[in-house]
């Protein structure tokens, strides 16, 4: 069980990701999916997932941290899940992401976060939609054959 932590409107400066994640790491909290969105106003939103049981601790660390660099709102969203499609050669198969996102959209499952690598596409969804998402992707990619 995971939580999503969003740190909004922090300065978009070199090293901001390290400033955010260093105290989280020092507290022994593992971070999973990370997304950073830079706005046109020189600020950034920084979002990541952690295990539910450590989410309150992580949010408190960030609230204390934001006071040190002048702003930033911390939002904690509990009960999210990561669902992934994994396969060697994912990068060379065009359309896998669109197919994945389409299958979820057809089931009215909203995607909160997206992370990709050469062999995996992961999405973060509401925990109560995770099982339905897994079934939708299983059906879409015909994994029972």
Q: Predicted segments — roles?
A:
Residues 1-145:
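A conserved regulatory-domain signal marking ACT and ACT-like small-molecule sensing domains
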């Amino acid at each position: 069980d995971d939580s999503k932590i969003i740190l909004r409107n922090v300065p978009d400066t070199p090293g901001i990701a390290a400033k955010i994640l260093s105290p989280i790491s020092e507290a022994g909290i593992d971070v999973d999916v990370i997304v950073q969105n830079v706005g046109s106003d020189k600020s950034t939103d920084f979002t990541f997932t952690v295990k539910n049981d450590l989410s309150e601790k992580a949010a408190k660390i960030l609230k204390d941290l934001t006071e040190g660099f002048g702003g930033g709102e911390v939002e904690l969203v509990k009960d999210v899940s990561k669902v992934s499609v994994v396969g060697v050669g994912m990068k060379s198969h065009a359309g896998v992401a669109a197919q994945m996102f389409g299958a979820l959209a057809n089931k009215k499952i909203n995607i909160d976060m997206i992370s990709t690598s050469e062999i995996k596409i992961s999405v973060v969804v509401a925990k109560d939609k995770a099982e339905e998402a897994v079934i939708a992707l299983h059906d879409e990619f015909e994994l029972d054959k």
